[in-house]
Amino acid sequence: MKVLILACLVALALAREKEQLSVPTEAVGSVSSSEEITHINKQKLETIKHVEQLLREEKLQDKILPFIQSLFPFAERIPYPTLPQNILNLAQLDMLLPLLQPEIMEDPKAKETIIPKHKLMPFLKSPKTVPFVDSQILNLREMKNQHLLLPQLLPFMHQVFQPFPQTPIPYPQALLSLPQSKFMPIVPQVVPYPQRDMPIQALQLFQELLFPTHQGYPVVQPIAPVNV
C-alpha cells in the first residue's frame, strides 16, 4: 500500500511540473503575438502618415500651379526623351570599354587593332656624312704608309718654317689721337709656310702626313709656290 501511495504522489508531482512548464510557454507565445500585433499597428500608422503627407503635397501643388500659370501663361513643360528598355546599363563597362579586359590586352594583335601605333619615318642616312667621319679616322694602311715615309723626310725635318714678312699697317689719325686704354692693339697673324729650297717630292710627302687625303676629297695644294 505504501508503494502505491508513493507512486501516486510522484505522478501528481510530475503532473504539476508539466502544468507549470506549459503556463510560461503559453505566456511567451502570447507575448510574442502581442509584439507582432504592435509592430503591425506601427507599420499601418506609418503608411497612413505617409499617405497623408502625399495628399497634402498634392493639394499644395494644385494651389501653386494655377498661380504660376497666371504669372507665365506661355510656359510649357520641358520635354525629355524616353529611353528604350533594351539600352545598355552604364555598369556594363566590359561592353563599353574593351581596353580594360586583361585577355584582350595580353593579345598583341588585339592591341594593334585597339591602339594603333604611330608609324615613324625611317631615318635616312645621307651619303655625305660617311666620308666626313672617315676623314677624322686614319686607316691602318695610311698609318703604315706614314711609317714608310718618315725615313725619307728625316733629312728635311731640321729645316725651320719661316713666317711671311710683316708689313706695317697704317692707322688713321682719328685712331692715333685716341688714348691706348680704349682699344686693344691689333696683333698681325703669322702664317707659316715651308722653305722654298725644299724639293717637290718632300713637300708632297710632308703634305700627305699633315693632311691625309681620302677618296672624294681633292689634294691639298701648297700654300706658297715652290721654285725648284
UniProtKB/Swiss-Prot annotation:
InterPro entries: Casein, Casein_beta, Casein_CS. Keywords: Milk protein, Phosphoprotein, Secreted, Signal. The keyword Secreted applies. The modification Phosphoserine is found at S30, S32, S33, S34. It comes from the Eukaryota. Residues 1-15 form the signal peptide. Its main location: secreted. One of its GO terms (cellular component) is extracellular space. Mammary gland specific. Secreted in milk. Pfam families: Casein. It is found in: Secreted. Disulfide bonds: none annotated. Belongs to the beta-casein family. Important role in determination of the surface properties of the casein micelles. This is Beta-casein. The gene is CSN2.
